[in-house]
Each structure stands twice: as structure tokens, then as C-alpha cells.
């Protein structure tokens, strides 16, 4: 699996948006970068589906543009006017050429899911990497209304319980993708460090 970060050149605040070509060409989140649909079109002619990790504005602001341009199916945990398929914990969904398990991971958002495949984890905002808070593994913020550090800690533990040892890459909602081959450690180690920091009740952004 080789996702393309189609928001890599964004000059506005947005999540990372990943395009995965293959048997089921998939966009993970839609982001908030105007013109994202044009960047997608530079890489693929058709888009089969959009899968949302959650529905915060930085993940869905440009969803309408993507849906209008490609008319893909829309998968989401929470209700959405354009949702064609609901997601539930334990579901399996094809991302590119790889089957991924849907893992319900609330804490940062009540509707948050992560996607775990054989080789890759799409962690959304539950686990992030090199995002300006900590360079080597951190967690999404939990200080806003409706968010919960306790639930996020449980979600990190759930990911660790269900993460295959074969996963060597992590694609977070913010920061940089992580690859074990170049990162010098495992995806599991990055998540464990994020969990340790969350359990110490460290603030998301240290002073």
C-alpha cells in the first residue's frame, strides 16, 4: 500500500487526506484544502469511495467538492446527509488492494474510527506523528467539549490489542506518515509512546 497525501502542499489548516489507488480506489478523509478534488484528479480518473475517520471540520470541509467531482460512495460512523454506508466496529472494508478492519476509537471525537490493515494503520487523530507537539508519537487533543482523555486512552489500548505485527506504516490525520523501515522503530512503539504520554495526562501541546 502506497497512499498519496493529496494535501501535502496545503496552505490552510487541514487534516492529511490519503488517496489509495487499487482494486477499490479510496480517499481517507476529505480535508479542508480548497481544490483537493483537482489534486485527486491528477492521480486517478475515478474514485470508488471516501472513508471518514471522523467528521471534524478539518476532515470534511471539502467533502462536498469531492463528492460532486467523483460521485463516490461515502462511508462514515456517524450520520451524514450523503452517507451511503455506515461503519461499525469490526467491519471490514477494502482500501485500495488491502482489507482493513474498522476499529471504533473515540476520545478525540465520538464518531472516530481507525482503519487497520495487514500492512498499514490509518489512525486519524487518535495517534499522530511529528505534528508539532511531539516529534515521535503523540495523541489527538482531548480538551474540547465532547472529548475525553479517558476514552482516548482506551482507544489507544484497543488499537494495540488489535494491531497485527505485520503493520509497518502509520498514516495519521496530522503530522507525517510513519514508516518502520525508515523510522527506526515499530508502529507499535510509536503508539505505546503516545499511550504513555496520554496516561501521564501530559497536555497535547507542552509549554
Can you annotate each of these PLM segments?
Residues 16-18, 85, 90-91, 113:
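Residue-level detector of beta-strand structural context in well-folded domains
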Residues 1-13, 42-43, 87, 152, ...:
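Haloarchaeal acidic low-complexity proteome signature biased toward cell-envelope/secretome components but also
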Amino acid at each position: 500500500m502506497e497512499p498519496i497525501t493529496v494535501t501535502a502542499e496545503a496552505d490552510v489548516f487541514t487534516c492529511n487526506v490519503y488517496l489509495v489507488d487499487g482494486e477499490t480506489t479510496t480517499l481517507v478523509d476529505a480535508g479542508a484544502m480548497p481544490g483537493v478534488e483537482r489534486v485527486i484528479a491528477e492521480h486517478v480518473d475515478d474514485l470508488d469511495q471516501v472513508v471518514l475517520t471522523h467528521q471534524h471540520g478539518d476532515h470534511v470541509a471539502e467533502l462536498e467538492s469531492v463528492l460532486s467531482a467523483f460521485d463516490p460512495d461515502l462511508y462514515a460512523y456517524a450520520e451524514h446527509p450523503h452517507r451511503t454506508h455506515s461503519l461499525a466496529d469490526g467491519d471490514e472494508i477494502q482500501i485500495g488492494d488491502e482489507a482493513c478492519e474498522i476499529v471504533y476509537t473515540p476520545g478525540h471525537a465520538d464518531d472516530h474510527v481507525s482503519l487497520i490493515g495487514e500492512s498499514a494503520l490509518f489512525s486519524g487523530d487518535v495517534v499522530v506523528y511529528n505534528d508539532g507537539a511531539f516529534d515521535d508519537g503523540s495523541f489527538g487533543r482531548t480538551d474540547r467539549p465532547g472529548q475525553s482523555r479517558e476514552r482516548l486512552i482506551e482507544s489507544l489500548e484497543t488499537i494495540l490489542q488489535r494491531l497485527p505485527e505485520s503493520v509497518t506504516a502509520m498514516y495519521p490525520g496530522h503530522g507525517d506518515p510513519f514508516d518502520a523501515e525508515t523510522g527506526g522503530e515499530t508502529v507499535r512503539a510509536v503508539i505505546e509512546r503516545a499511550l504513555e504520554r496520554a496516561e501521564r495526562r501530559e497536555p497535547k501541546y507542552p509549554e
